[in-house]
From Swiss-Prot:
<protein>
    <recommendedName>
        <fullName>Uncharacterized protein DDB_G0286379</fullName>
    </recommendedName>
</protein>
<feature type="compositionally biased region" description="Pro residues">
    <location>
        <begin position="242"/>
        <end position="262"/>
    </location>
</feature>
<feature type="region of interest" description="Disordered">
    <location>
        <begin position="1"/>
        <end position="20"/>
    </location>
</feature>
<feature type="compositionally biased region" description="Low complexity">
    <location>
        <begin position="95"/>
        <end position="155"/>
    </location>
</feature>
<feature type="compositionally biased region" description="Basic and acidic residues">
    <location>
        <begin position="1"/>
        <end position="13"/>
    </location>
</feature>
<feature type="region of interest" description="Disordered">
    <location>
        <begin position="91"/>
        <end position="193"/>
    </location>
</feature>
<dbReference type="InterPro" id="IPR007972">
    <property type="entry name" value="Mtfr1"/>
</dbReference>
<feature type="compositionally biased region" description="Polar residues">
    <location>
        <begin position="166"/>
        <end position="193"/>
    </location>
</feature>
<feature type="region of interest" description="Disordered">
    <location>
        <begin position="236"/>
        <end position="374"/>
    </location>
</feature>
<feature type="compositionally biased region" description="Low complexity">
    <location>
        <begin position="277"/>
        <end position="300"/>
    </location>
</feature>
Length: 374
């Protein structure tokens, strides 16, 4: 029986640049489309993935892909497909069938455990279940029962009218993307998937066509994405319940060294006045006979700077040395009769009496010159 494709499928089959965004070739585009769908159906996981852990949301996505153009068409197509199939996801028939199948399986398990005499009834029930599975496959419906997991969230049914896949879980239509009460129930690990790709794309030994393979690949990608989301939710719960790490014990940093002292270098001031103020000149002229006058207030006032002119004008008394100095700088010989004697007195008197004996009587003598010998 020829499969009838949806009217939107021509976007994937045209020979356009959109072929590189096909779902069975680029895993990054597939994850990107799933995140766009989750953004409308389950805001909690969408917010936590895009805000708290963007590395999960954008893993494997090529950063050069544009969010507009052909990738935008694919997003619109998947959104429209989910809206069109929402009535099938909410139909009570699917839920009733799932409930009946679950009840039959539970009854079979109870009969095997309690009554060994009902083996024939159990075999009949198992045969009926197998017949139902064969009939669903003949009607081009795919019921992929994942025996490694304990829930029915992995079951996908194939619709012959539009070529889409729908979820057969009993909860809300898009509850496959929601966070479960126990996140560890979803972490079944990707290792549970078949190791051989040919086994993953076969049902009862019959190979699937291209459209069915595409759906199977989409199912596997959804399973991986669901496990990654559950792992992130579980890690988030563990991190929130874990106590904060203790602060690292470390010694306080050593204090900074003190700044070096600021040394101010005072330059010596050799200020020499070119002249002396008029007050000093007048006082010096008036008191020329008494240079060391203590009543002169101008001279007794301390000068702020060293002035050579004041020193020269004041003519300080030099200290006399008791020893007579020779021109060479060596002390002269002391006189023998230092205190004086009678001979010296007589000699001095004779010299003073006869000093004018050889002088001319015409020549006048200056009294001032003789005063030195008197």
């Amino acid at each position: 029986m020829e499969t009838k494709y949806h009217e939107y499928d021509d976007v994937q089959t045209k020979d356009t640049p959109s072929n590189k965004y096909s779902l069975n070739e680029n895993r990054g585009d597939l994850i990107f489309l799933i995140m766009e769908i989750i953004g409308e159906s389950c805001n909690s996981i969408y917010d936590s993935f895009t805000l708290d852990a963007p590395q999960f949301a954008f893993r494997g996505i090529d950063k050069t892909l544009s969010k507009d153009g052909e990738i935008g068409k694919l997003i619109t197509i998947i959104k429209n497909l989910i809206k069109e199939q929402s009535y099938l996801l909410k139909s009570p028939m699917t839920n009733n069938n799932n409930n009946n199948n679950n009840n039959n399986n539970n009854n079979n398990n109870n009969n095997n455990n309690n009554n060994n005499n009902n083996n024939n009834n159990n075999n009949n029930n198992n045969n009926n279940n197998n017949n139902n599975n064969n009939n669903s496959y003949n009607n081009n419906n795919i019921n992929d029962n994942n025996n490694s997991s304990n829930n029915n969230n992995n079951n996908l049914e194939y619709n012959t009218k539009g070529g889409e896949y729908i979820s057969s879980n009993q909860s809300s239509p898009l509850s496959i993307y929601s966070t479960p009460p126990n996140p560890s129930s979803y972490v079944s690990s990707p290792l549970n998937q078949p190791a051989n790709n040919t086994e993953a794309f076969q049902i009862n030994g019959n190979e699937l066509d291209a459209a069915q393979i595409k759906i199977k690949q989409l199912e596997l990608e959804l399973q991986k994405f669901k496990e990654a989301g559950a792992l992130f939710a579980m890690n988030k719960i563990n991190n929130s319940s874990a106590p904060p790490p203790p602060p690292k014990a470390c010694a306080p940093p050593p204090p900074p060294p003190p700044p070096p002292p600021i040394t101010v270098v005072k330059q010596p001031s050799f200020l020499m006045k070119k002249g002396v103020n008029n007050n000093n000149n007048n006082n010096n002229n008036n008191n020329s006979s008494n240079t060391n006058d203590s009543n002169n207030t101008n001279n007794t006032k301390p000068q702020p700077t060293f002035n050579f002119a004041d020193v020269l004008l004041n003519r300080p008394q030099l200290k006399r040395v008791s020893k007579d100095r020779s021109p060479g700088g060596t002390p002269a010989k002391e006189p023998k009769n230092k205190s004086g004697s009678v001979e010296d007195a007589l000699l001095k008197a004779i010299v003073s009496k006869f000093k004018h004996a050889n002088s001319s009587p015409v020549k006048s003598h200056d009294d001032s010159s003789d005063s030195d010998f008197e």
